[in-house]
Amino acid sequence: MNSLIISTKDIKKFIISVLIPIVIGFSSNFISEIISKTDTNFQYLELIKPGFFPPPYIFPIIWTILYILMGISAYLVSKKDLNSLKVRDAMFYYYLQLGLNFIWSILFFGLELRLTSLVVIGIMIVVVTVMIIKFTKVDKRAAYLNLLYLAWLFYAFFLNYVIWSINR
């Protein structure tokens, strides 16, 4: 019965863990719009791209789901012993991929550096793969929660590549 009791501290830590990637992700989009002086949805619509590309309203839905899953996974890992080298190592890769995620939107939309953003997303794939491996050593559930994110990154890499190659 005690395992069902959740402390206020744990609830607060959970909420913060979920909010961090959401705030980082959407603030990156906001900064991109300030830099480009254009709504990212409009910018996406204006790009030359094949007809099989998803409509712009899909991206905020997918990213919100992915950010929530990222946050939950970070919570699961960080609630373990934070003094543990395995936990610190895993969280290093978590925050590294969040940083790369943050700059990708700015590069792609804000600065319109499509090739540079393609390189960044390629690096993200490697970092997220390492993060998942590190998470597995701490909490397998946390690792599994990021498999959809990794799959989406491969798809995003493909989209980024096609947009770069058609619009250069």
Place the predicted regions along the sequence by residue.
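Perimembrane loop-to-helix junctions flanking transmembrane segments
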Residues: 39-53
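Membrane-interface helix caps and helix-loop-helix hairpins in membrane proteins
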Residues: 104-116, 137-138, 164-168
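Non-cytosolic membrane-interface motifs at loop->transmembrane helix junctions
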Residues: 110-123, 144-145
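N-terminal signal-anchor transmembrane alpha helix
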Residues: 3-33
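Terminal transmembrane helical module of multi-pass membrane proteins
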Residues: 134-168
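Interfacial helix-start motif at the membrane-water boundary
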Residues: 50-68
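Core segments of transmembrane alpha-helices
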Residues: 63-74, 97-100
